[in-house]
Amino acid sequence: MDAKLSPNQGLNISGIGLASSLAAGLGIAALTLDWIANRNPWQGTSLTLPLLLCTIASAIAGYFVVPLLQALKTGQIIREDGPQAHLKKAGTPTMGGIFFIPVAVVGACVLSNFATEVLAVSALTLSYGLIGWIDDWQILRRKSNKGISPRMKLALQICFAAAFCLWLMFNQPANITSIALPWVSFALPLGFLFWPLAGFVLVAESNATNLTDGIDGLAGGTVAIALLALGAIVAPTSPALMVFCAALSGSCLGFLAHNRNPARVFMGDTGSLALGGALAAVALLTNSLVALFILSGIFFVETLSVMAQVSYYKATKGPDGKGKRLLKMAPLHHHLELSGWSELQVVSSFYVIATILAVICLAIAPF
């Protein structure tokens, strides 16, 4: 008898199984990378210890904070025009970023002995988290999907990005305005043009991770993979920022204990904007923009899918004011859901892609 293969066949894994597999995989990766670099994995300046400590601390913090968020009635407002399977998520607490982001920041600061660059990146991370919190709070207060206006959100992102760039301008070496190309012994000098690019990267990366946060465990897992790889790449030149990346990666893993399918809490803009800001800030500080571009492949594709959807809709708009859609729904992960993929299939596939991108980055990195 002929049988039609559905997108969900062949995937027999639970949300907790997927999250556990990711945590185990990143733990083994951290140990391996420390071993390759001749680092003691159980010292503060490593990948393994910050990853492990912040995973545990974030997971434990969630058991206290998630019930509090439930009691405060911070339930997520679900879009009615989205995938119908998401309607059952209505009421799930959001703002999860308020516990796992601070856990990572505190852990990184302590383990790095409050290194200046870690304090700077932490300040940018918390600033973007604050923007997200304001947006999340407005959504909850108004009981709709509309938070602060896009213009206000963008203005705040630009302001904090400008402040970080000013600090970078006066506290980092002059060659920071040259972009290192890892596969050739050459740096692309940008001069003053570096600064508008830096501001753009901070804003774009935070919004890209924000768009990726649409399925249980998706943003948390893919960012955890990117952060650990970025930490390994920057380790030779900035051990303190390696610790920061490992701590934030671990905190994402701890958050997945509560955000894996079916999620008990969402990170909200509080978490997603902070994560994107952190990735961009570390890359700018360590001249790792090429690595960031590769590691952020999933986030950029998600963003491009939204841009393509909007552009195509406007270009095909007829006299009735309605246009055609390129995708069933943007971002891409929602299109895949509406095409018959399960949430777990989308998330596991994106984890695999994120891992491949991380391996590519590590392969070309000048260790």
Curated annotation (Swiss-Prot):
Gene Ontology biological process terms, A to Z: cell division; cell wall organization; peptidoglycan biosynthetic process; regulation of cell shape
Protein family membership: Belongs to the glycosyltransferase 4 family. MraY subfamily.
Intracellular or extracellular location(s): Cell inner membrane
InterPro entries per UniProt: Glycosyl_transferase_4, PNAcMuramoyl-5peptid_Trfase, PNAcMuramoyl-5peptid_Trfase_CS
Cofactor(s) this protein requires: Mg(2+)
Pathway note: Cell wall biogenesis; peptidoglycan biosynthesis
Pfam families from the UniProt entry: Glycos_transf_4, MraY_sig1
A cellular component term, taken from the record's GO annotations: plasma membrane
Main localization category: membrane
Transmembrane segments: 13-33, 49-69, 95-115, 119-139, 154-174, 183-203, 215-235, 237-257, 281-301, 347-367
The keyword Cell division belongs to this UniProt entry's keyword annotation: yes
Transferase listed as a keyword: yes
PROSITE patterns: MRAY_1, MRAY_2
Name of the protein in its database record: Phospho-N-acetylmuramoyl-pentapeptide-transferase
Keywords tagged on the record: Cell cycle, Cell division, Cell inner membrane, Cell membrane, Cell shape, Cell wall biogenesis/degradation, Magnesium, Membrane, Metal-binding, Peptidoglycan synthesis, Transferase, Transmembrane, Transmembrane helix
Purpose: Catalyzes the initial step of the lipid cycle reactions in the biosynthesis of the cell wall peptidoglycan: transfers peptidoglycan precursor phospho-MurNAc-pentapeptide from UDP-MurNAc-pentapeptide onto the lipid carrier undecaprenyl phosphate, yielding undecaprenyl-pyrophosphoryl-MurNAc-pentapeptide, known as lipid I.
Catalytic activity: UDP-N-acetyl-alpha-D-muramoyl-L-alanyl-gamma-D-glutamyl-meso-2,6-diaminopimeloyl-D-alanyl-D-alanine + di-trans,octa-cis-undecaprenyl phosphate = di-trans,octa-cis-undecaprenyl diphospho-N-acetyl-alpha-D-muramoyl-L-alanyl-D-glutamyl-meso-2,6-diaminopimeloyl-D-alanyl-D-alanine + UMP
EC number: 2.7.8.13
Enzyme class, broadest EC rank: transferase
Annotated PANTHER family: PHOSPHO-N-ACETYLMURAMOYL-PENTAPEPTIDE-TRANSFERASE (PTHR22926), PHOSPHO-N-ACETYLMURAMOYL-PENTAPEPTIDE-TRANSFERASE HOMOLOG (PTHR22926:SF5)
Gene Ontology molecular function: metal ion binding; phospho-N-acetylmuramoyl-pentapeptide-transferase activity; UDP-N-acetylmuramoyl-L-alanyl-D-glutamyl-meso-2,6-diaminopimelyl-D-alanyl-D-alanine:undecaprenyl-phosphate transferase activity
Membrane topology: Multi-pass membrane protein
